[in-house]
Amino acid sequence: MAAKDVKFGNDARVKMLRGVNVLADAVKVTLGPKGRNVVLDKSFGAPTITKDGVSVAREIELEDKFENMGAQMVKEVASKANDAAGDGTTTATVLAQSIITEGLKAVAAGMNPMDLKRGIDQAVIAAVEELKKLSVPCSDSKAIAQVGTISANSDETVGTLIAQAMEKVGKEGVITVEEGTGLQDELDVVEGMQFDRGYLSPYFINKPETGAVELETPFILLADKKISNIREMLPVLEAVAKAGKPLLIIAEDVEGEALATLVVNTMRGIVKVAAVKAPGFGDRRKAMLQDIAILTGGTVISEEIGMELEKAALEDLGQAKRVVINKDTTTIIDGVGEETTIQGRVTQIRQQIEEATSDYDKEKLQERVAKLAGGVAVLKVGAATEVEMKEKKARVEDALHATRAAVEEGVVAGGGVALVRVAAQLTELRGQNEDQNVGIKVALRAMESPLRQIVSNAGEEPSVVANNVKAGDGNYGYNAQTEEYGNMIDFGILDPTKVTRSALQYAASVAGLMITTECMVTDLPKGDAPDLGAGAGGMGG
């Protein structure tokens, strides 16, 4: 086992604080509308330019092992805030730095670290309650656009696009961000349920100019099995032909004689048919077939529940207003399923999302909710160069997360004002002893740090602005973009409550651990380890 280097007390804390400051100083230059860029060198290709706090934090590794431990713990704050709310990483880092710096000063002055931590925790719990009181719901498009704009570093086009996307697909819809091909940002909305399976034979195409199959008011047969024998399907085909409507078959697979017969029938115009494979695999395929059945008011023909294809009747088939199938995708528009049944299914899937442990499962379940409830929107980010594209895409993703958080828990005044107002409400808060009171003061002082940093990045004097803001009340604050004071809500400067809350909670959590650190252990650098193998000297001869 390698030899260890151990540091205690103040020696350890000073080293740790140095690491915290290096990381936090690099991250906090990006805060606010006048935040600066950070250039990150890559081992290959062009460097990345970013204003995204968590991207900067992830790049930082320090040579000194003890300093690096401090930096890595603050990196954890940024990552956790990013995972919880998708934004607020820089705010969380600034808060953590302030709590750690002030907290370690108090420890050096002889305060009890455990009581300091208890005081900080008490202040944060009270602050979260105050934030909830300040929070206002964010439901209209204008507020959503404002939140998106602020989170995308004051890029109005991004905020407006996200608001449009949410309007089109609803709050539950899936919105994805992709790299576009042009210079302009575009919004692409897919209404109805779309899944990644195309037609099984190009002979089904009835719109040669677009290379697609379009079926108007079709019946939809859903089968959880492979269909290779046409005899199984004859009763359904005859019933559909009599009804004079087209038929879409969604099955595990359609092959051999069955597929050939369907193609011949289509080409002769006897009955208009198209076949596609069911989406997904295994249990997920069964679940998605059930989703389609509920959306279209049909039944999945499955041998597991004792249903046979030969005995299927028209009542078992789903229906939709229109179906469009191309090479890779199938879109079902306006299924005739009952709204109450669809809502019941959505509630059931939401419950599964709550219980899911892996991010992949959550994402897939979220997609299913979107397909049933709203639709899917794709934001295509446009830019002139690859470097700009990457930077912009990261900002758009941040803005999207922030708007979702805003819809979820509401919004508070932005620009660091909400935390200043919260701190003002808690001046009377007291702990069980003087050391805990100092901990409370440390947390309350830290709540001013995001406002001070935004002002500092804008090139103004933080103390002057902070005093002016504190002299006001409610949503009165400082707009660093235009350098004027006024109502932050009227300025359109909003922060999602969830983002502010998460930033404060994670910053206090990690900072509390660091203040109560008394010993740090790391491997000795290779060159410093004692050389135990220095051989015994040979006999001179």
UniProtKB/Swiss-Prot annotation:
GO terms for cellular component: cytoplasm. PROSITE patterns: CHAPERONINS_CPN60. The keyword Cytoplasm applies. CDD domains: GroEL. Transmembrane segments: none annotated. GO terms for biological process: protein refolding. Its main location: cytoplasm. The keyword RNA-binding does not apply. It catalyses: ATP + H2O + a folded polypeptide = ADP + phosphate + an unfolded polypeptide. SUPFAM superfamilies: GroEL apical domain-like, GroEL equatorial domain-like, GroEL-intermediate domain like. It holds the Pfam family Cpn60_TCP1. It comes from the Bacteria. ATP binds at residues 30-33, 51, 87-91, 415, 495. InterPro entries: Chaperonin_Cpn60_CS (IPR018370), Cpn60/GroEL (IPR001844), Cpn60/GroEL/TCP-1 (IPR002423), GroEL-like_apical_dom_sf (IPR027409), GROEL-like_equatorial_sf (IPR027413), TCP-1-like_intermed_sf (IPR027410). Its EC number is 5.6.1.7. Keywords: ATP-binding, Chaperone, Cytoplasm, Isomerase, Nucleotide-binding. NCBIfam families: GroEL, PRK00013.1, PRK12849.1, PRK12850.1, PRK12851.1. Belongs to the chaperonin (HSP60) family. Together with its co-chaperonin GroES, plays an essential role in assisting protein folding. The GroEL-GroES system forms a nano-cage that allows encapsulation of the non-native substrate proteins and provides a physical environment optimized to promote and accelerate protein folding. PANTHER family: 60 KDA HEAT SHOCK PROTEIN, MITOCHONDRIAL. This is Chaperonin GroEL. It comes from Pantoea ananas. The gene is groEL.
